[in-house]
Amino acid sequence: MQNSHLSQQRFSDLALHRIVQQAIKEKGFEFCTPIQALSLPITLKGQDIAGQAQTGTGKTIAFLTATFHHLLQKNNINSSEQPRALILAPTRELVVQIANDANFLVQATGLKTGLAYGGEGYDKQLKVIDRGIDILIGTTGRVIDYVKQGIIRLDYIQVVVLDEADRMFDLGFIRDIRYLLRKCPVPQQRLTMLFSATLSYKVRELAFEHMNDPQYVEIEPLQKTGHRIREELFYPSNQDKMALLMTLLEEEWPERCIIFSNTKHRCEEIWGYLSADGHRVGLLTGDVMQKKRLSLLKQFTDGTLDVLVATDVAARGLHIPDVTHVFNYDLPDDCEDYVHRIGRTGRAGESGISISFACEEYAINLPAIEEYIGHSIPVSQYDAKALIEDLPTPHRIKRGAFDSRSNLQRTVKRLKKTY
């Protein structure tokens, strides 16, 4: 980890609970990131906060540190075995990631965490919750399900965290969030924290209805795309697009890269060509079953896979270390998605490379993206005659356990036969 992205604020100088302080030290964290340096002095006093910073800047450790500190400071016995902290995130992958990031604090403090997310693991999640937990980390839908069944009560909540808050609002979870917050003690009786890469005025206005005189802190990047990311743009014809991608992969030979496309079908096509060419590649789209999604992310993180082809489902909130390259096979329709996509590289002080294709179909999105990020993306030329000519016959996706939609279709067919 490079020190260039850290502040001068030492964790040891913060008024942290001694157990949390020791865990932070043993983890090797000495200096705070800017968002941690600004937010922790506020939250450690028990004051609500809305924090805005780019992904990969330490938001998760900021709110986890404050959460564990707050629960230990209260020092009350959780005889109810009901959660005392509620951490909400927009996706199940982010829920799992937050839980993984919290492991070192769990081991140090003895506080117990439980997960609540849809897609799989219902009984497994229930068993953990039934044994009693201190911190519940989940998506809104599954948490509401448990609350309505009487499995979970939120009367004892002392800390609430909304991570990627703007994304939750954008996805239409505002009604769910309001429902859960109203089940918690009033804002004056709890600590509430919001953290996100982007936090619009609309989101803050809505969220502040459920907060107690919050302070707003912002870490403004030098540029929206991050100054450690080298951006490059090509104008390929539709015919050259796949050949250009495969040629660049051979030339760049990235240690670990993510290729983004706008549609599931295009992602499957890219995966098919790269798989046939011998790349260690995974496919992450909305149709991939939850168990497979988590397995793919683990394989990509531990280096079993070198390439991940993804839709924007993977573009927000997921911390995957050491991503060297991001390819925008399609320029996204949403300008913010461009920033979030290339933000997968150049994280935590490291450098990264972003390569985008302004093809015949999606070049129309380029002016709005460049206006949004505040600069033109440097253009590179390519020699069509130098591109890989003999593309392999692409592998086809085998529909089955890999595809949640096909499982649903088979279930429907069985029900029709039964009834």
Curated annotation (Swiss-Prot):
It comes from the Bacteria. GO terms for molecular function: ATP binding; ATP hydrolysis activity; RNA binding; RNA helicase activity. It catalyses: ATP + H2O = ADP + phosphate + H(+). Gene3D superfamilies: P-loop containing nucleotide triphosphate hydrolases (3.40.50.300). ATP binds at A53, Q54, T55, G56, T57, G58, K59, T60. A motif (Q motif) lies at residues 9-37. It is an enzyme of class 3 (hydrolase). InterPro entries: DEAD/DEAH_box_helicase_dom, DEAD_box_RNA_helicase, Helicase_ATP-bd, Helicase_C-like, P-loop_NTPase, RNA-helicase_DEAD-box_CS, RNA_helicase_ATP-dep_RhlB, RNA_helicase_DEAD_Q_motif. SUPFAM superfamilies: P-loop containing nucleoside triphosphate hydrolases. A motif (DEAD box) lies at residues 163-166. Residues 241-388 form the Helicase C-terminal domain. Component of the RNA degradosome, which is a multiprotein complex involved in RNA processing and mRNA degradation. DEAD-box RNA helicase involved in RNA degradation. Has RNA-dependent ATPase activity and unwinds double-stranded RNA. HAMAP family: DEAD_helicase_RhlB (MF_00661). This is ATP-dependent RNA helicase RhlB. It comes from Histophilus somni (strain 2336) (Haemophilus somnus). The lineage of its organism: Bacteria, Pseudomonadati, Pseudomonadota, Gammaproteobacteria, Pasteurellales. The gene is rhlB.
